[in-house]
Amino acid sequence: MNIYCMRHGRTNYNDLCLCNDDPAQDVHLTDVGIKQAQSAALALRDIEFERMIVSPLPRTYQTAEIVNQYHSIPIEVHADLADIRSGFDGKPVSDYFAAISHDPLKARVNGGESLLDHKQRVLRFIDWLKVQKDKALLVVAHEETLRVLIAHFEGGVADAQLRDIHVGNCEYRHYVLHR
């Protein structure tokens, strides 16, 4: 199976450097994010995707809808693709990182999940992918989620190095999943 993993377009919360893991918050693509998604859509227009799988957060769906203008295929939400539940929704990203600095892999704050909790959730999504019959899928998710996918597909990344992986807005990578 060909899997294209893409991060959502730039959002108002990216501009404000705020955490978001609540689908009810008004987090949306900015004009820059829309242009990024349009550019990615153009680059991916000839790929014969059968489905697009997105996280429950609206910015991923909004990005997928723009890419889907060339495909007109189902867009499905998968809960395991959600961004890390930081416990800092609407608060500065820097505050979140300060709060977990004592144990970046295992720290859980404000009822959120740890990086390792999040990793397990994303690995569960990969197990789900392995039983799908599609030939080509587009997965639209978040940088934190994509770090786990990249580490899995490319290998050689220790848990402590996950956050060293950078994925720009609307950056995508192609992988082949052998079942």
Language model segments and positions:
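Glycine-rich phosphate-binding loop signature in dinucleotide/nucleotide-binding domains
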Residues: 45-48, 129-136
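Short beta-strand scaffold positions
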Residues: 54-55, 120, 140-141
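Active-site-proximal alpha-helix that buttresses catalytic centers in soluble enzyme cores
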Residues: 9-71
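GST superfamily/GST-like fold recognition
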Residues: 143-147, 171
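Extreme N-terminal starter segment of soluble prokaryotic enzymes
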Residues: 1-4
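Short, conserved phosphate/pyrophosphate- and ester-handling motifs at nucleotide-, phospho-/glycolipid
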Residues: 8, 142
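Phosphate-handling substructures
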Residues: 27-28, 69-123
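Domain-level recognition of soluble alpha/beta enzyme cores
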Residues: 156-179
